[in-house]
């Protein structure tokens, strides 16, 4: 950055406002533009600053169980704050925040919650569900299928990113295209309001129609893609060799595609069931029958294609998996994809059985069309007009079967019957031999069908009069309702007959508040159940309270109605419903009952006072005047009524609570007091109100769990106006530090709020205060994408060479993240470009490790030393080699060609790293692909095509074609590796061909240790990381082998005795480390650098002790528990792990105790096995013959590997 550019930044920072976007972008790196949530997640993961925000977003709505009761406002406010509480409870990672890895995507959360509200609305509105049992069954299996698919998503993405085979790439991408369409369309409709949701489902070329085509075997359908992968003529999904990545990718795509296929079936069933219920609720029998048919047909079709006959998709996939599992070489498979599929085979078989044995809970029989409808002409006749019964109208009837929650389609409508003088006919229906109920529906003229009533299986006669009483009770004309109800009841109408949502005439009367009907007819009948509940557990008192029928509420209470009755699903009382609706008179009538329990809680712990807060202050005042009211009641989430008043920004309600002496400082389960919510929301109105009552509320109130103040929250949530309002207060305390020693200045810097930063500095915030990690504000600013923040801090005296706990300077922070502009600015201001971290890394090392090319170029242009070693004796170019970053390697060699000079230490180290990477590739190939017949030339070409030899080509020193020059050495190395491994497997016999006998014996004797290791611990060999241990044996063998074959020249001696010295039982520690990790799939702390939590340490110690016992038992031949107190072993291991001390010392002490051999004898044994002329060790008993073989696999010190450098580099440079 030139001085002119620096002046531009300084000038921009000096302005009162933040510089405009265009100016800022000139200073920021290209990669610092706006990123999607997924892009930001990937960046944070890549630089090891991932946080829990990303994983929580998708589940956030699930934490807001009280949405239907308390409302959308509370949900949208509390959800993101709950996320922050989770993040900060374990200590905020300030570096993660500085990189925007903790940014709370409020818009995304709001969108998710709005979708959730719409879903809830749809469910609450679903009063009648004819296919409810179908929905339950489908949803349960759908959730399982989707869980499996979601768990497989990451690896399926990996397949898409790494697939190279053109043959299967188009097929796999076809599966992915369908998957993306499926998920995108589902997401598009998920949160729509009910009417739009249905409209999208019914689109002629919409999602349902498109998904039905998934079964079509042609074109770009999912079915055609899966059939291509299953085609036995190609066998794409069956590996030919153990590392046939193409086949494993095809196999994984096949499995994933099958799960998607099943998911489509369940999604279609779920949506068509919803449509069937939608039409049922609307009384649209024609479309209900059509959707009923759709559900049955879809299930039958998909069931057949997935599990039918000998050609079911799932059967075919399982057959392929079983074929692969039976391959002779598959036990050595090193494919993560394959291992996962093996674990999921059982799940696929379970899914197959579920589908195959499932019968949809539908009644296939269709009732007969009604034909016997009689209008009485006796004393029971009911003259017209009454209700819908008017002379001249036509009435038709239809029937539907119902049994245990299962339904049939509607029957055909009967012939029309014309009403003439009489109403309410009697219907005759035959007894159902299958003992199912018959639901009777009626339709006047061409109007909407109505549910008329239920006939039990044994009933043959049904008088159509009960629905008319229910309709009369709902009549808005109360006088007419009384007259009609009187007549209908006299003629036999059943007051308790249930209709919509299982509501009776009593519920209907309560809804309308028709006291006259209730007094004159219903309540005089002592047998009437006034506690009768509808489908959701609402009694007539609930209905009246929610409708604000104050007089009817009083009438019911006077006649003994339970004033504290609770609904079945949410435990709401009538008082909850009345307060939520804001009906103050109804609330007062309820409160007058001597039996009222004013503090009853619903499912989420909210009392009527909580719900009242979300309505009006008059209702709140009525409750507060009750002597038993709990003003400080807390919900399950710890929210008080005052919390809700602040969240709802209702100052009148807040004032009422303050006047009633409510506690204003109670903290919820996330340790948030009301003032913390006000600050987090950025509510200036409520903040000013709370500040105005400082005698009751402290503006410096801290959370109990992490010591955050309101100012911390306002800054973290980027509520600048709220932060400024707090900073106006003379008594604001800027010295309070949160957990992790976080100041408000740290947070302001980490969230990039330059105006707040300036204000804090004006108010005297300590610019050099350090976080728990030792970061100053300048360290954090160096991580931010805005270089002007660093400018402000430095201009205010920030220490440019401040050190963190890891000895990082701000320059290190900027370089590691790749903040090129900030790096340049810091260097211009005198930052030490050669400063080292605790591990000896310079800024250049860190930039290289982070693959930040532009920053590396900047540092090199500013004079960074590219020959500076870190504590591991690595130069920056070595980091690039380890990363396989070819462009970075070339950049360094352009700057200094001597870096590949084999006569220099740095050149030899580079070549050693390259050789080790190549040897690892070869070892993995041969150890896993012994069934393949590729010759050296073909293998060389494969390595070349895969780019595995590019580094070797780059480091070739001679003129001419690097590939052709390096090729002979690679071919010899391949041949050598192949030969030694062949001899290893044979375990005996003399070498043939051009290899001389002594050298081949060395090869065999050296590799025999690895074979012993394999036989003794076979489980380890199956795991990926076991390759590292045998690789060391190969490297030693190669070094001893090459001189005798005259492959290279060297001044050093490579005899076995030069490699072995001071061997004792500690030599087994590396083996034990690998052994333990492979059995537990965990990496243990054998070096004692950090402590481990108690439960983790306990579990780990038990596993280590168990495997250690197995190892010692194998060596001795008798149970180790008979010789050693294993409980004591486990206890000592646990103490070591928990305290962070080396486990190695514990293991070693017991190994010494267990062994009868002293250190000298162990050394003799090891040398014997490596010697070309074995001698007899008389002191060794037969019981210990296995031990040296185990020890020799790991006993050599890692530093001795450095002696391989000379030979390895000569291989590539000759």
UniProtKB/Swiss-Prot annotation:
SUPFAM superfamilies reported for this sequence: Ankyrin repeat
Stored InterPro entries: Ankyrin_rpt, Ankyrin_rpt-contain_sf, Multifunctional_ANK_Repeat
Chain positions covered by the region annotation Helix H8 is the probable transmembrane region of the tetrameric pore inserted in the target cell membrane: 250-269
ANK repeats: 464-497, 501-532, 536-565, 570-600, 604-633, 637-666, 670-699, 706-734, 740-769, 773-802, 806-835, 839-868, 872-901, 906-936, 966-994
Gene Ontology cellular-component terms listed: extracellular region; host cell presynaptic membrane; membrane; other organism cell membrane
GO MF annotations in UniProt: toxin activity
Protein name: Delta-latroinsectotoxin-Lt1a
Tissue: Expressed by the venom gland.
Family, per entry: Belongs to the cationic peptide 01 (latrotoxin) family. 04 (delta-latroinsectotoxin) subfamily.
Pfam families, sorted: Ank, Ank_2
Main subcellular location of this protein, as a coarse class: secreted
PROSITE patterns: ANK_REP_REGION, ANK_REPEAT
Region of interest (Helix H2 is the probable transmembrane region of the tetrameric pore inserted in the target cell membrane), residue spans: 64-89
Oligomeric form and interacting partners: Homotetramer in membrane.
Propiece residues: 1020-1214
Compartments, as annotated in UniProt: Secreted; Target cell membrane
GO process annotations (BP): exocytosis
Native source species: Latrodectus tredecimguttatus
Domain of life: Eukaryota
Role according to the record: Insecticidal presynaptic neurotoxin that induces massive neurotransmitter release at insect (but not vertebrate) neuromuscular junctions. Native toxin forms cation-permeable pores (with high permeability to calcium) in lipid membranes locust muscle membrane and artificial lipid bilayers. May bind to insect neurexin-1 homolog, insect adhesion G protein-coupled receptor L1 homolog, and insect receptor-type tyrosine-protein phosphatase S homolog, and induces neurotransmitter exocytosis both by forming tetrameric pores in membranes and signaling via G protein-coupled receptor.
């Amino acid at each position: 950055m030139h001085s002119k550019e620096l002046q531009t930044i300084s000038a921009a920072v000096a302005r009162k406002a933040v510089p405009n976007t265009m100016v800022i972008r000139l200073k920021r790196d290209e990669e610092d533009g706006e990123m999607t949530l997924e892009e930001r997640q990937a960046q944070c993961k890549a630089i090891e600053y991932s946080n829990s925000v990303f994983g929580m977003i998708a589940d956030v709505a699930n934490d807001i169980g009280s949405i239907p009761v308390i409302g959308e406002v509370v949900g949208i406010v509390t959800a993101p704050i709950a996320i922050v509480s989770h993040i900060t409870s374990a200590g905020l990672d300030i570096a993660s925040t500085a990189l925007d890895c903790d940014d709370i995507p409020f818009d995304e959360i709001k969108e998710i919650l709005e979708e959730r509200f719409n879903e809830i609305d749809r469910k609450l509105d679903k009063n009648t569900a004819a296919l409810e049992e179908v929905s339950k069954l489908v949803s349960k299996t759908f959730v399982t299928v989707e869980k499996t698919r979601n768990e497989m998503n990451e690896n399926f993405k990996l397949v898409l990113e790494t697939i190279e085979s053109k043959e299967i790439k188009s097929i796999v991408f076809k599966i992915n295209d369908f998957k993306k369409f499926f998920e995108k369309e589902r997401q598009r409709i998920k949160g729509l309001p009910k009417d739009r949701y249905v409209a999208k489902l019914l689109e002629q070329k919409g999602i349902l129609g498109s998904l039905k085509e998934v079964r079509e075997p042609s074109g770009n359908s999912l079915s055609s893609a899966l059939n291509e992968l299953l085609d036995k003529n190609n066998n794409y999904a069956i590996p030919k060799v153990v590392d046939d990545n193409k086949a494993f990718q095809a196999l994984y795509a096949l499995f994933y595609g099958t799960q998607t296929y099943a998911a489509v079936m369940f999604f279609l069933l779920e949506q068509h069931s919803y449509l069937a219920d939608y039409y049922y609720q609307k009384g649209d029998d024609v479309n209900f029958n059509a959707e009923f048919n759709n559900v049955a047909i879809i299930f039958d079709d998909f069931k057949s294609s997935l599990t039918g006959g000998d050609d079911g998709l799932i059967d075919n996939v399982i057959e392929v998996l079983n074929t692969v599992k039976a391959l002779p070489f598959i036990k050595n498979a090193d494919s993560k994809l394959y291992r996962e599929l093996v674990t999921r085979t059982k799940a696929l078989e379970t899914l197959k059985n579920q589908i195959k044995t499932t019968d949809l809970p539908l009644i296939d029989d269709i009732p007969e069309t009604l034909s016997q409808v009689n209008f009485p002409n006796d004393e029971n006749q009911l003259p017209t007009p009454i209700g819908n019964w008017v002379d001249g109208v036509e009435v038709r009837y239809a029937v539907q079967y119902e049994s245990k929650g299962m339904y049939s389609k509607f029957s055909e409508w009967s012939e029309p019957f014309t009403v003439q003088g009489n109403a309410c006919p009697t219907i005759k229906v035959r007894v159902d031999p299958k003992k199912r109920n018959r639901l009777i529906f009626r339709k006047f003229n061409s109007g909407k069908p109505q549910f008329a009533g239920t006939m039990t299986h044994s009933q043959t006669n049904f008088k159509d009069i009960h629905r008319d009483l229910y309709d009369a009770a709902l009549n808005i004309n109360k006088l007419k309702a009384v007259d009609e109800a009187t007549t209908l009841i006299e003629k036999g109408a059943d007051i308790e007959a249930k209709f919509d949502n299982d509501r009776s005439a009593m519920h209907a009367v309560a809804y309308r508040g028709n006291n006259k009907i209730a007094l004159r007819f219903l309540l005089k009948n002592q047998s009437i159940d006034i506690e009768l509940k509808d489908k959701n557990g609402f009694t007539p008192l609930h209905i009246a309270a929610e409708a604000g029928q104050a007089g009817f509420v009083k009438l019911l209470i006077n006649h003994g109605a339970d004033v504290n009755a609770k609904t079945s699903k949410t435990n709401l009382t009538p008082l909850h419903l009345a307060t939520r609706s804001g009906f103050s008179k109804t609330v007062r009538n309820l409160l007058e009952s001597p039996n009222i329990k004013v503090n009853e809680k619903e499912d989420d712990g909210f009392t009527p006072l909580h719900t009242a807060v979300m309505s009006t202050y008059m209702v709140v005042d009525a409750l507060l005047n009750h002597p038993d009211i709990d003003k400080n009641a807390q919900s399950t989430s710890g929210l008080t009524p005052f919390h809700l008043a602040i969240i709802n920004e209702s100052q009148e309600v807040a004032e009422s609570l303050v006047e009633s002496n409510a506690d204003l400082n109670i903290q919820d389960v996330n340790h948030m007091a009301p003032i913390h919510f006000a600050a987090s929301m950025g509510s200036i109105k409520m903040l000013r109100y709370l500040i105005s009552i400082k005698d009751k509320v402290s503006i410096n109130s801290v959370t109990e769990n992490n010591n955050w103040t309101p100012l911390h929250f306002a800054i973290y949530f980027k509520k600048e106006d709220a932060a400024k309002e707090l900073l106006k207060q003379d008594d604001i305390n800027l010295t309070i530090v949160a957990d992790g020693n976080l100041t408000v200045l740290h947070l302001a810097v980490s969230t990039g709020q330059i105006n707040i930063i300036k204000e804090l500095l004006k108010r005297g915030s300590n610019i050099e205060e350090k976080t728990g990690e030792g970061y100053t504000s300048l360290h954090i600013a160096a991580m931010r994408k805005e270089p002007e923040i660093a400018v402000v801090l430095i201009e205010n005296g920030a220490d440019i060479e401040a050190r963190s706990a890891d000895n990082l300077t701000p320059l290190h922070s900027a370089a590691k993240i790749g903040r090129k502009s900030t790096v340049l600015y810091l260097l211009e201001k005198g930052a030490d470009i050669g400063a080292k971290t605790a591990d000896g890394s310079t800024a250049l090392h860190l930039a290289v490790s982070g693959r930040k090319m532009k920053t590396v170029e900047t540092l090199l242009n500013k004079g960074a030393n590219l020959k500076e070693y870190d504590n591991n004796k690595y130069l920056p170019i070595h980091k690039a080699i380890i990363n396989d970053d070819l462009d970075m390697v070339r950049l360094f060699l352009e700057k200094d060609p001597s870096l590949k000079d084999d006569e220099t230490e740095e050149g030899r180290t580079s070549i050693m790293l390259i050789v080790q990477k190549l040897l690892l590739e070869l070892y993995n190939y041969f150890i896993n692909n012994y069934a393949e017949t590729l010759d050296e030339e073909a293998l060389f070409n494969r390595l070349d095509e895969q780019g595995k030899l590019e580094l070797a080509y780059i480091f070739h020193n001679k003129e001419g074609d690097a590939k052709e020059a390096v090729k002979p050495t690679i071919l010899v190395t391949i041949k050598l590796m192949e030969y030694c491994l062949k001899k290893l497997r044979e375990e005996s016999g003399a070498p043939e061909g051009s290899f001389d006998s002594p050298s081949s014996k060395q090869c065999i004797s050296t590799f025999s240790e690895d074979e012993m290791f394999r036989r003794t611990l076979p489980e380890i060999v199956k795991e990926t990381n076991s390759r590292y241990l045998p690789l060391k044996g190969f490297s030693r063998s190669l070094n001893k082998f090459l001189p005798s074959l005259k492959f290279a020249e060297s001044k050093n001696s490579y005899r076995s005795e030069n490699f072995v010295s001071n061997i004792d039982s500690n030599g087994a520690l590396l083996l034990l480390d690998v052994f333990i990790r492979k059995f537990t799939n965990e990496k243990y702390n054998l070096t004692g650098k950090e402590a481990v939590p108690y439960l983790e340490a306990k579990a780990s110690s038990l596993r280590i002790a168990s495997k250690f016992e197995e190892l010692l038992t194998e060596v001795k031949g008798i149970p180790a528990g008979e010789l050693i107190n294993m409980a004591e072993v486990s206890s000592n291991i646990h103490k070591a792990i928990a305290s962070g001390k080396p486990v190695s010392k514990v293991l070693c002490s017991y190994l010494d105790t267990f062994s009868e051999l002293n250190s000298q004898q162990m050394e003799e044994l090891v040398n014997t096995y490596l010697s070309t002329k074995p001698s007899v060790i008389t002191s060794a008993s037969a019981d210990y013959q296995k031990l040296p073989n185990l020890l020799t696999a790991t006993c050599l010190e890692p530093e001795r590997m450095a002696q391989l450098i000379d030979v390895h580099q000569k291989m590539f440079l000759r």
